Regions:
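Bacterial N-terminal signal peptides that target proteins for export
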Residues: 1-9
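Bacterial N-terminal signal peptides
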Residues: 10-19
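Boundary at the C-terminal end of the N-terminal hydrophobic targeting segment
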Residues: 20-25, 31-33
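Edge beta-strand at a domain terminus
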Residues: 29-30, 151-176
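Tryptophan-anchored aromatic micro-motifs
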Residues: 37-59, 95-97
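N-terminal glycine/threonine-rich, aromatic-flanked beta-hairpin/loop signature
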Residues: 59-106, 113-117, 144, 155
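Amphipathic hydrophobic-ligand
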Residues: 62, 91, 124-132, 165-171
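Hydrophobic/aromatic beta-strand elements that line small-molecule binding cavities or substrate pockets
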Residues: 67-72, 95-100, 128-143, 149-151, ...
Length: 176
């Protein structure tokens, strides 16, 4: 009889422990980092990017906002394309990067895009090289978010000498 009680208690304890470990691993779908768990950020977003003055956060005078599409894929990869009229046709390629969850409704992402050739038309803004965006994202609902962060331009293959760089504030709306 004692053996049956001990065996029953052991099975009950192992069953409870198994469910507890599974519950902790799932964490209600709130996995962090570049995990495989689904995240509300996944999907394609219509994004409005506004260049801002880094020190004050005010819009850069005379610089219009840019419309972009950002796609956040499962596993932490992303792609981007935009309509920035400051680039000449074919001058900037699509952006590729990564994203990760940093909090319950917070994320960060980084992407880079090649600048294929120096600007040929005045005001000769961009040199051949690449553009990098580093942004922090705060989701407000499952269908909208805001972000802010750095936008850097690097000439050639340099990683230490950014050409005209700045900051940007963005709003994202899920594409339906």
């Amino acid at each position: 009889m004692n053996t049956k009680k001990t065996l029953l208690a052991t099975v009950a304890a192992l069953t409870f422990a198994g469910y507890s470990v599974a519950g902790m691993a799932n964490d209600g779908g709130l996995a962090f980092g570049r995990s495989q768990a689904p995240a509300p950020l996944e999907g394609t977003w219509v994004v409005t990017i506004q260049p801002i003055v880094c020190s004050s956060g005010i819009d850069v005078p005379g610089v219009p906002s840019v419309r972009a599409y950002l796609t956040f894929a499962p596993g932490g990869t992303m792609t981007e394309t935009n309509s920035n009229m400051a680039f000449e046709p074919g001058q900037r390629g699509p952006g590729h990067g990564y994203w990760e969850r940093t909090g319950r409704t917070s994320y960060q992402f980084a992407l880079e895009a090649f600048i294929q050739f120096d600007s040929k038309l005045a005001p000769f803004r961009y040199k051949r090289g690449y553009q990098r965006l580093d942004q922090t994202v705060e989701m407000h609902t499952t269908d909208d978010w805001t972000s802010s962060g750095r936008v850097q331009f690097f000439a050639g293959t340099s990683t230490t000498d950014p050409s005209p760089s700045g900051c940007a504030r963005s709003t994202g709306a899920r594409m339906f």
